[in-house]
């Protein structure tokens, strides 16, 4: 177990969503504007549904912060669901049940397994919590963690590389382009590919269908040696993969060259080392994606995640009605046609949490002054290795 942990609570159409972060060092300065800016990024994206026109997510801090600085206590965050006023009859915590039960479970969703596991008769009891609305609080948590990382010189960015089979021209994308697309409604660095992606999304929306895609996360400024090979559950690659796979609709994660490693010989995969003029080693390639042996190796961290199409279709798939056993069309909920750009923001947030936890665990400190000093001393020791070689 690391130093940081968080839990979230709340339903998609409930009164509010909540998160509690435990283990943050005291003295971390937090910007309310930055917290809200990350939530706004999650709400944007070409292909999002009508819900995003209702909600304007803003973070309320209920504990653990005074005058803009963490105090070492658990940090409690809340986002109010403005749409709750339209759902009070169906989501009342103590009132009598009202509204039609959802029994036509959706293929690809948590509906069927959830009602069986928790012995429910209404799939709304499942879909309200399994909804990706929960990621609002993951982004809020990530917004805190990325401010901690920024104070340590570590930067996180992402971009969408594929939607619905339309892919960017990776060779044409410069490293400096990634992270400057935050205002783009697709978070895409390739304008030509972005135009084709929008066309595919429009086509899918007309057909009542949905689209998935791929996003890439890039992290710069990480020290060499973050993570460890000594135990399976402390390997940084495993922790990152698990965090990203926990995001709703994510079906695959790869680091660096990823699955391409299976098709090529080692001579074409492993990054050769060279000694630079400054007396430090460097690599001409980064197929490892910045991770070797479960540890950072000094190169930028590169992680990609594949998102499946959202399982709520406006042209529903066939399913069964759990109340009657008959073949019916799956139920419909207000949903998105494509949420890959939003998922990239959630991916950044989960990456930020894992890395913030790794840093706080490895350079353990109860306050930011000591944490920054500990990391600075470690970086200085690594620099001396090559100076004295």
Question: How should these model regions be labeled?
Answer:
Residues 1-389:
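Generic N-terminal targeting/processing segments that precede catalytic cores or assembly contacts
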């Amino acid at each position: 177990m690391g130093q940081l942990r968080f839990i979230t609570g709340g339903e998609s159409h409930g009164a509010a969503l909540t998160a509690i972060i435990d283990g943050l060092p005291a003295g971390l300065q937090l910007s309310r504007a930055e917290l809200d800016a990350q939530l706004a990024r999650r709400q944007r994206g070409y292909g999002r549904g009508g819900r995003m026109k209702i909600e304007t997510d803003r973070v309320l801090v209920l504990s653990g912060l005074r005058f803009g600085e963490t105090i070492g206590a658990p940090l409690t965050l809340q986002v109010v669901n403005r749409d709750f006023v339209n759902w009070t009859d169906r989501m009342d915590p103590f009132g009598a049940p009202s509204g039609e039960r959802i029994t036509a479970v959706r293929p690809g969703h948590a509906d069927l397994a959830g009602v069986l596991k928790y012995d429910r008769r209404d799939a709304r009891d499942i879909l309200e919590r399994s909804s990706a609305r929960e990621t609002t609080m993951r982004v809020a948590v990530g917004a805190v963690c990325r401010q901690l990382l920024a104070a340590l010189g570590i930067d996180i960015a992402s971009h969408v590389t594929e939607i619905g089979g339309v892919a960017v021209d990776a060779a044409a994308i410069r490293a400096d382009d990634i992270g400057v697309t935050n205002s783009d409604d697709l978070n895409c660095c390739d304008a030509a590919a972005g135009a084709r992606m929008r066309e595919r999304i429009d086509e899918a929306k007309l057909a009542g269908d949905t689209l998935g895609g791929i996003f890439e996360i890039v992290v710069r400024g990480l020290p060499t040696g973050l993570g460890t090979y000594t135990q399976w559950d402390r390997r940084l690659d495993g922790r990152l993969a698990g965090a990203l796979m926990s995001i709703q609709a994510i079906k695959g994660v790869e680091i660096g060259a990823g699955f391409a490693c299976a098709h090529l010989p080692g001579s074409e995969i492993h990054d050769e080392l060279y000694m630079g003029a400054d007396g430090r080693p460097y690599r001409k390639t980064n197929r490892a994606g910045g991770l070797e042996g479960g540890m950072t190796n000094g190169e930028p961290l590169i992680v990609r995640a594949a998102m499946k199409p959202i399982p709520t279709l406006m042209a529903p798939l066939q399913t069964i009605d759990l109340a009657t056993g008959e073949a019916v069309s799956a139920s419909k909920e207000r949903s998105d046609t494509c949420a890959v750009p939003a998922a990239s923001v959630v991916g950044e947030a989960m990456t930020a949490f894992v890395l913030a936890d790794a840093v706080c665990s490895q350079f353990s400190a109860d306050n930011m002054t000591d944490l920054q000093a500990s990391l600075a001393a470690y970086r200085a020791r690594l620099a001396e290795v090559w100076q004295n070689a």
